[in-house]
Amino acid sequence: MAGHSKWSQIKRTKAVVDSKRGALFTRLGREIMVAARAGSDPAGNFQLRTAINKARAAAMPASNIDRAIAKGSGQGGEGAQLEDVRYEGYGPGGMAVMVEALTDNRNRTAADLRLAFSKNGGNLGENGCVAYLFEHRSEVSIKTEAGSEERLLESLLDLDADGYELNDETTATIFGPFAGLEALQDGLRQQGWDVKEWGHQWATTTNVSISDPATAQSCLNLLDALESLDDVRSVSANLELDTKLEIN
Protein backbone atom coordinates (compact mmCIF):
# COMPACT_ATOMS: atom_id res chain seq x y z
CA MET A 1 0.00 0.00 0.00
CA ALA A 2 1.37 3.42 -0.96
CA GLY A 3 2.46 5.49 2.02
CA HIS A 4 2.70 2.47 4.30
CA SER A 5 5.53 0.20 5.42
CA LYS A 6 5.12 -3.39 6.54
CA TRP A 7 6.90 -4.60 9.67
CA SER A 8 8.99 -7.00 7.56
CA GLN A 9 10.31 -4.04 5.56
CA ILE A 10 10.94 -1.97 8.68
CA LYS A 11 12.99 -4.82 10.17
CA ARG A 12 15.32 -4.86 7.15
CA THR A 13 16.39 -1.28 7.87
CA LYS A 14 17.03 -1.74 11.61
CA ALA A 15 20.74 -1.89 12.38
CA VAL A 16 22.04 -4.29 14.99
CA VAL A 17 23.54 -2.09 17.70
CA ASP A 18 26.49 -3.27 19.76
CA SER A 19 24.37 -3.78 22.89
CA LYS A 20 22.25 -6.35 21.03
CA ARG A 21 25.00 -8.01 19.00
CA GLY A 22 26.02 -10.40 21.79
CA ALA A 23 22.44 -11.61 22.23
CA LEU A 24 22.11 -12.05 18.45
CA PHE A 25 25.27 -14.16 18.32
CA THR A 26 23.94 -16.32 21.15
CA ARG A 27 20.69 -16.99 19.27
CA LEU A 28 22.50 -17.70 16.01
CA GLY A 29 24.87 -20.03 17.82
CA ARG A 30 21.97 -21.99 19.23
CA GLU A 31 20.44 -22.35 15.76
CA ILE A 32 23.75 -23.71 14.49
CA MET A 33 23.93 -26.15 17.42
CA VAL A 34 20.49 -27.55 16.65
CA ALA A 35 21.21 -27.80 12.92
CA ALA A 36 24.51 -29.59 13.59
CA ARG A 37 22.65 -32.49 15.22
CA ALA A 38 22.12 -33.87 11.70
CA GLY A 39 25.83 -33.67 10.87
CA SER A 40 28.72 -31.26 11.21
CA ASP A 41 29.49 -30.99 7.48
CA PRO A 42 27.58 -28.06 5.92
CA ALA A 43 27.99 -29.57 2.45
CA GLY A 44 25.66 -32.42 3.37
CA ASN A 45 23.45 -30.57 5.86
CA PHE A 46 21.29 -27.86 4.30
CA GLN A 47 19.84 -26.71 7.63
CA LEU A 48 23.35 -26.20 9.00
CA ARG A 49 24.43 -24.43 5.81
CA THR A 50 21.47 -22.08 6.20
CA ALA A 51 22.24 -21.35 9.86
CA ILE A 52 25.90 -20.67 9.08
CA ASN A 53 24.93 -18.32 6.25
CA LYS A 54 22.71 -16.32 8.63
CA ALA A 55 25.53 -16.13 11.16
CA ARG A 56 28.04 -14.93 8.59
CA ALA A 57 25.57 -12.32 7.30
CA ALA A 58 25.44 -10.97 10.87
CA ALA A 59 29.27 -10.85 11.04
CA MET A 60 29.44 -13.58 13.67
CA PRO A 61 33.10 -14.58 14.26
CA ALA A 62 34.21 -17.84 12.64
CA SER A 63 35.43 -19.14 16.00
CA ASN A 64 31.91 -18.78 17.43
CA ILE A 65 30.47 -20.66 14.47
CA ASP A 66 32.99 -23.50 14.79
CA ARG A 67 32.34 -23.77 18.52
CA ALA A 68 28.57 -23.97 17.99
CA ILE A 69 29.00 -26.71 15.36
CA ALA A 70 31.19 -28.71 17.75
CA LYS A 71 28.66 -28.42 20.56
CA GLY A 72 25.71 -29.36 18.39
CA SER A 73 27.41 -32.33 16.78
CA GLY A 74 27.92 -34.08 20.10
CA GLN A 75 31.05 -32.59 21.59
CA GLY A 76 29.15 -30.56 24.17
CA GLY A 77 25.62 -31.89 24.44
CA GLU A 78 23.93 -28.49 24.67
CA GLY A 79 22.23 -28.76 21.29
CA ALA A 80 20.30 -31.87 22.29
CA GLN A 81 18.48 -29.91 25.00
CA LEU A 82 17.02 -27.30 22.67
CA GLU A 83 13.69 -27.52 20.84
CA ASP A 84 11.76 -25.33 18.41
CA VAL A 85 8.52 -23.87 19.78
CA ARG A 86 6.05 -21.49 18.13
CA TYR A 87 3.93 -18.96 20.01
CA GLU A 88 1.14 -16.67 18.81
CA GLY A 89 -0.47 -13.57 20.23
CA TYR A 90 -2.01 -10.15 19.72
CA GLY A 91 -0.56 -6.69 20.10
CA PRO A 92 -2.04 -3.18 20.33
CA GLY A 93 -4.50 -2.26 17.58
CA GLY A 94 -5.25 -5.91 16.80
CA MET A 95 -1.76 -6.62 15.47
CA ALA A 96 -1.12 -10.36 15.02
CA VAL A 97 2.26 -11.69 16.17
CA MET A 98 4.08 -14.95 15.45
CA VAL A 99 7.09 -15.85 17.59
CA GLU A 100 9.53 -18.68 16.94
CA ALA A 101 11.69 -19.70 19.89
CA LEU A 102 14.52 -22.11 20.54
CA THR A 103 14.39 -23.18 24.17
CA ASP A 104 15.49 -25.74 26.73
CA ASN A 105 12.66 -24.75 29.08
CA ARG A 106 9.17 -24.16 27.64
CA ASN A 107 7.76 -22.86 30.92
CA ARG A 108 10.44 -20.17 31.23
CA THR A 109 10.03 -19.08 27.62
CA ALA A 110 6.24 -18.91 27.84
CA ALA A 111 6.46 -16.87 31.05
CA ASP A 112 8.93 -14.42 29.49
CA LEU A 113 6.75 -14.00 26.42
CA ARG A 114 3.57 -13.57 28.45
CA LEU A 115 5.23 -10.82 30.49
CA ALA A 116 6.53 -9.03 27.38
CA PHE A 117 3.08 -9.12 25.77
CA SER A 118 1.24 -7.91 28.88
CA LYS A 119 3.69 -5.08 29.63
CA ASN A 120 3.29 -3.73 26.10
CA GLY A 121 -0.47 -3.81 25.56
CA GLY A 122 -0.77 -7.28 24.06
CA ASN A 123 -1.58 -10.81 25.12
CA LEU A 124 -0.14 -14.25 24.44
CA GLY A 125 -2.76 -16.42 22.74
CA GLU A 126 -3.38 -20.07 21.98
CA ASN A 127 -1.74 -21.94 19.13
CA GLY A 128 -3.62 -21.21 15.92
CA CYS A 129 -5.15 -17.92 17.04
CA VAL A 130 -3.30 -15.88 14.38
CA ALA A 131 -1.54 -18.48 12.20
CA TYR A 132 -4.26 -18.20 9.55
CA LEU A 133 -3.12 -14.61 8.91
CA PHE A 134 0.33 -15.79 7.80
CA GLU A 135 1.88 -18.03 5.17
CA HIS A 136 5.08 -19.92 6.03
CA ARG A 137 7.18 -19.74 2.88
CA SER A 138 10.71 -19.89 1.50
CA GLU A 139 12.49 -16.63 0.73
CA VAL A 140 15.78 -16.15 -1.11
CA SER A 141 17.56 -12.80 -1.39
CA ILE A 142 19.66 -12.23 -4.51
CA LYS A 143 21.84 -9.45 -5.85
CA THR A 144 20.40 -7.65 -8.87
CA GLU A 145 21.31 -4.83 -11.21
CA ALA A 146 19.30 -2.10 -12.89
CA GLY A 147 17.43 -3.55 -15.84
CA SER A 148 17.76 -7.17 -14.72
CA GLU A 149 14.07 -7.73 -13.95
CA GLU A 150 13.31 -9.28 -17.34
CA ARG A 151 16.14 -11.77 -16.91
CA LEU A 152 14.84 -12.58 -13.43
CA LEU A 153 11.37 -13.30 -14.77
CA GLU A 154 12.82 -15.68 -17.34
CA SER A 155 14.77 -17.48 -14.61
CA LEU A 156 11.71 -17.93 -12.41
CA LEU A 157 9.82 -19.70 -15.20
CA ASP A 158 12.12 -22.68 -14.68
CA LEU A 159 11.94 -22.64 -10.88
CA ASP A 160 9.31 -23.47 -8.28
CA ALA A 161 8.80 -19.83 -7.31
CA ASP A 162 5.58 -18.06 -6.41
CA GLY A 163 6.76 -14.50 -6.98
CA TYR A 164 9.35 -11.86 -6.19
CA GLU A 165 9.84 -8.38 -4.76
CA LEU A 166 12.40 -5.82 -5.92
CA ASN A 167 13.72 -4.31 -2.70
CA ASP A 168 15.82 -1.73 -4.55
CA GLU A 169 18.08 -1.67 -7.61
CA THR A 170 20.60 -4.00 -5.96
CA THR A 171 18.56 -6.77 -4.31
CA ALA A 172 15.41 -8.80 -4.85
CA THR A 173 13.56 -11.36 -2.74
CA ILE A 174 12.23 -14.51 -4.39
CA PHE A 175 9.59 -16.52 -2.55
CA GLY A 176 8.19 -19.99 -3.00
CA PRO A 177 6.72 -23.03 -1.20
CA PHE A 178 8.01 -23.79 2.30
CA ALA A 179 9.40 -27.20 1.35
CA GLY A 180 11.24 -25.89 -1.71
CA LEU A 181 13.88 -23.68 -0.07
CA GLU A 182 16.95 -25.74 -0.95
CA ALA A 183 15.84 -26.31 -4.55
CA LEU A 184 14.94 -22.63 -4.99
CA GLN A 185 18.27 -21.24 -3.85
CA ASP A 186 20.21 -23.95 -5.72
CA GLY A 187 18.23 -23.19 -8.88
CA LEU A 188 18.91 -19.47 -8.63
CA ARG A 189 22.63 -20.14 -8.27
CA GLN A 190 22.56 -22.40 -11.32
CA GLN A 191 20.84 -19.59 -13.25
CA GLY A 192 23.81 -17.37 -12.44
CA TRP A 193 22.31 -15.26 -9.65
CA ASP A 194 24.37 -14.15 -6.65
CA VAL A 195 22.42 -15.60 -3.71
CA LYS A 196 22.95 -13.55 -0.54
CA GLU A 197 20.54 -14.98 2.05
CA TRP A 198 17.84 -17.61 2.30
CA GLY A 199 15.46 -18.96 4.90
CA HIS A 200 11.85 -19.53 5.94
CA GLN A 201 9.67 -16.52 6.74
CA TRP A 202 6.13 -15.91 7.97
CA ALA A 203 4.61 -13.72 5.25
CA THR A 204 1.39 -11.90 6.08
CA THR A 205 -1.80 -12.56 4.14
CA THR A 206 -3.77 -9.78 5.88
CA ASN A 207 -2.22 -6.65 7.38
CA VAL A 208 -3.36 -4.31 10.14
CA SER A 209 -2.86 -0.65 9.23
CA ILE A 210 -1.97 1.61 12.16
CA SER A 211 -2.22 5.38 11.76
CA ASP A 212 -2.32 6.48 15.42
CA PRO A 213 1.21 7.42 16.61
CA ALA A 214 0.74 6.17 20.18
CA THR A 215 -0.64 2.81 19.05
CA ALA A 216 2.12 2.45 16.47
CA GLN A 217 4.77 3.14 19.10
CA SER A 218 3.20 0.58 21.43
CA CYS A 219 3.30 -2.01 18.64
CA LEU A 220 6.98 -1.37 17.97
CA ASN A 221 7.77 -1.46 21.68
CA LEU A 222 6.16 -4.89 21.95
CA LEU A 223 8.03 -6.25 18.93
CA ASP A 224 11.33 -4.91 20.24
CA ALA A 225 10.65 -6.44 23.66
CA LEU A 226 9.93 -9.83 22.11
CA GLU A 227 13.02 -9.73 19.91
CA SER A 228 15.22 -8.93 22.91
CA LEU A 229 14.35 -12.19 24.68
CA ASP A 230 17.18 -14.73 24.66
CA ASP A 231 15.01 -17.68 23.58
CA VAL A 232 13.36 -15.87 20.66
CA ARG A 233 14.79 -16.59 17.20
CA SER A 234 12.28 -14.65 15.06
CA VAL A 235 9.28 -12.32 15.40
CA SER A 236 6.75 -11.70 12.61
CA ALA A 237 3.78 -9.34 12.65
CA ASN A 238 1.09 -8.15 10.25
CA LEU A 239 1.76 -4.52 11.17
CA GLU A 240 1.54 -1.85 8.48
CA LEU A 241 2.48 1.71 9.42
CA ASP A 242 1.74 5.03 7.75
CA THR A 243 5.13 6.31 6.58
CA LYS A 244 4.17 9.82 7.72
CA LEU A 245 4.09 8.74 11.36
CA GLU A 246 6.82 10.16 13.58
CA ILE A 247 7.87 7.33 15.88
CA ASN A 248 11.09 6.26 17.58
UniProtKB/Swiss-Prot annotation:
Transmembrane segments: none annotated. InterPro entries: Integrase-like_N, TACO1_YebC-like_2nd/3rd_dom, TACO1_YebC_N, Transcrip_reg_TACO1-like, Transcrip_reg_TACO1-like_dom3, YebC-like. Its main location: cytoplasm. Keywords: Cytoplasm, DNA-binding, Transcription, Transcription regulation. It holds the Pfam family TACO1_YebC_N. It comes from the Bacteria. GO terms for molecular function: DNA binding. The keyword Transcription applies. Belongs to the TACO1 family. This is Probable transcriptional regulatory protein Syncc9902_0542.
